[in-house]
């Protein structure tokens, strides 16, 4: 696994964060050291896939990056005639996802597409995964994407939505931000790396509260919505149609 050193030296002209070749190369290390509870979420996605994926249906991983959630789901699906469709708008991520998934034998076909998730049709879905993806979409596009997912899910289908959260109470919000930064420092990131990455993400990752997500999902039509995992200011919501 290549180590993330992207922000380790001072960057004079710090641009917006992008999922380019450099990020794709170190992404597994970056996300493990940056997102508390990430491995737990990936493992649980497989457990949820085993429970919710139905025969003759499709599974979508929207914003699949290098395919960790796709692989976890595929390893645990026990039903026949299931297809997994992974989508990411970063060509370097897509290329690595294909390589990663092709390294493991499976009878479940996986199609990895390089496209904007807003352009993808969702059809005959028993499970949809949005793992730290929605936060990178313009806020005005989030409702329409969730509506499309809801329409494309079969009755009883599952959406897994993992995100970084903000909190209404400033004291709590600041505490959880500080704990997240402490988590990153404990994983070997310097103060410079933490501050430069935070600045690079400022304009491209706009986060909502967990309550905003839950209300939005209920407004879309989901019958059962619940926060099932949280560690500091990162968490995951399940929504069942």
Curated annotation (Swiss-Prot):
What reaction(s) does this enzyme catalyze? prephenate + S-adenosyl-L-methionine = carboxy-S-adenosyl-L-methionine + 3-phenylpyruvate + H2O
Q: Which Pfam families match?
A: Methyltransf_25
* GO BP: tRNA wobble uridine modification
A Gene Ontology molecular function term of the record: S-adenosyl-L-methionine binding
**This enzyme's EC code(s):** 2.1.3.-
- Going by the record, the broad EC class of this enzyme is transferase
| Entry binding sites for S-adenosyl-L-methionine | 38, 63-65, 88-89, 116-117, 131, 198
Q: Which CDD domains match?
A: AdoMet_MTases (cd02440)
* Keywords of this entry: S-adenosyl-L-methionine, Transferase
Q: How does it assemble?
A: Homodimer.
Q: What job does this protein perform?
A: Catalyzes the conversion of S-adenosyl-L-methionine (SAM) to carboxy-S-adenosyl-L-methionine (Cx-SAM).
Q: Which family does it belong to?
A: Belongs to the class I-like SAM-binding methyltransferase superfamily. Cx-SAM synthase family.
NCBIfam families named among the record's database cross-references: carboxy-S-adenosyl-L-methionine synthase CmoA, PRK15451.1
In terms of HAMAP family, this protein maps to: Cx_SAM_synthase (MF_01589)
What protein name is recorded for this chain? Carboxy-S-adenosyl-L-methionine synthase
Organism name:
Actinobacillus succinogenes (strain ATCC 55618 / DSM 22257 / CCUG 43843 / 130Z)
Q: Lineage of this protein's species? A: Bacteria, Pseudomonadati, Pseudomonadota, Gammaproteobacteria, Pasteurellales
């Amino acid at each position: 696994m290549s180590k993330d050193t992207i922000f380790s030296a001072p960057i004079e002209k710090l641009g917006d964060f992008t999922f380019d070749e450099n990020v794709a190369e170190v992404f597994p290390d970056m996300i493990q050291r940056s997102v508390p509870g990430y491995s737990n979420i990936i493992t649980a996605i497989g457990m949820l896939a085993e429970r919710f994926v139905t025969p003759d249906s499709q599974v979508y991983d929207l914003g699949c990056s290098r395919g960790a959630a796709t692989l976890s789901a595929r390893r645990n699906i026990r039903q026949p005639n299931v297809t997994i469709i992974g989508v990411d708008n970063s060509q370097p991520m897509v290329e690595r996802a294909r390589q990663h998934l092709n390294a493991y034998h499976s009878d479940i076909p996986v199609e990895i597409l390089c496209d904007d998730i807003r352009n993808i049709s969702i059809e005959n879905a028993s499970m949809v995964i949005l793992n730290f993806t929605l936060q990178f979409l313009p806020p005005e596009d989030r409702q329409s994407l969730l509506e499309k997912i809801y329409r494309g899910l079969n009755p009883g289908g599952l959406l897994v939505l993992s995100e970084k959260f903000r909190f209404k109470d400033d004291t709590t919000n600041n505490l959880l931000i500080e704990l997240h930064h402490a988590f990153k420092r404990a994983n070997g990131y310097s103060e410079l790396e933490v501050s430069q990455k935070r600045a690079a993400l400022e304009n491209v990752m706009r986060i909502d509260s967990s309550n905003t997500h839950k209300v939005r999902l209920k407004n879309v039509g989901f019958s059962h919505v619940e926060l099932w995992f949280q560690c500091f200011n990162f968490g995951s919501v399940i929504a069942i149609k």
